[in-house]
């Protein structure tokens, strides 16, 4: 294992994670800065809300692939070393997305990019994440709540994989997600958080006339 080679890999992984997908899609195709609309976030949820399902899907796929590509860089370049180094590369991508060098070290909440890291590292663990998150989203209609509850469950489940480094990285991701979702947590407590236009809770509120027009929460 070459320390210099891995250092370069980690830097490249950070730069890949820093790629501001939502901002670029907004500016190139809509001539607007997504940071000035909706929640102001550059990630998937705000992209769907502000730019529509096609652009939102593109942002989702690219942000997931950022995490996957960064995680698998050591494999792509045929570098030898412990498998946990893939997780470190993935963590660098998450840091890049959250603190992008291209956005003055600001960025998104890294939910999609974190999913991409799990996809690149352990397909079964990624499948577990999907099985936890998607039903949670369908039930609650809240992306933020689903993300926070899911990462806690996923962290607990990580112990069953007997991979201490996976558990450590998942724990760090959990802390980071809670920190990055501080404003969402406040809105959830105050019943002001926006919901997605599908799922059981959305359909319940719609059928009872309880839906409110989305506010531009910052």
UniProtKB/Swiss-Prot annotation:
Pfam families in the record: G3P_acyltransf
Gene Ontology terms: cellular component: plasma membrane
Lineage: superkingdom: Bacteria
Protein name: Glycerol-3-phosphate acyltransferase 2
Subunit structure, interactors included: Probably interacts with PlsX.
Family: Belongs to the PlsY family.
Chief location category: membrane
Pathways involved: Lipid metabolism; phospholipid metabolism
InterPro entries per the UniProt record, alphabetical: G3P_acylTferase_PlsY
Enzyme class: transferase
């Amino acid at each position: 294992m070459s320390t210099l080679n891995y250092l370069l890999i980690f830097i490249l992984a950070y730069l890949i994670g820093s790629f501001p997908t939502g901002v670029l899609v907004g500016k190139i195709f809509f001539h607007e800065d997504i940071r000035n609309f909706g929640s102001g976030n550059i990630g998937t949820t705000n992209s769907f809300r502000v730019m529509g399902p096609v652009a939102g899907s593109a942002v989702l796929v690219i942000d997931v692939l950022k995490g996957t590509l960064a995680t698998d860089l050591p494999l792509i370049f045929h570098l030898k070393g412990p498998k946990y180094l893939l997780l470190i590369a993935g963590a660098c991508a998450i840091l890049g997305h959250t603190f992008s060098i291209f956005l003055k070290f600001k960025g998104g909440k890294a939910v999609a990019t974190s999913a991409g890291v799990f996809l690149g590292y352990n397909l079964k663990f990624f499948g577990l994440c999907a099985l936890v998150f998607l039903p949670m989203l369908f039930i609650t209609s809240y992306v933020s709540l689903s993300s926070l509850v899911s990462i806690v469950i996923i962290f607990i489940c990580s112990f069953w994989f007997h991979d201490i480094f996976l558990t450590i990285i998942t724990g760090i991701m959990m802390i980071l997600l809670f920190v990055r979702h501080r404003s969402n947590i406040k809105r959830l407590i105050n019943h002001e958080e926006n919901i997605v236009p599908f799922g059981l809770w959305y359909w319940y509120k719609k059928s009872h006339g309880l839906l409110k027009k989305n506010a531009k929460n910052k």
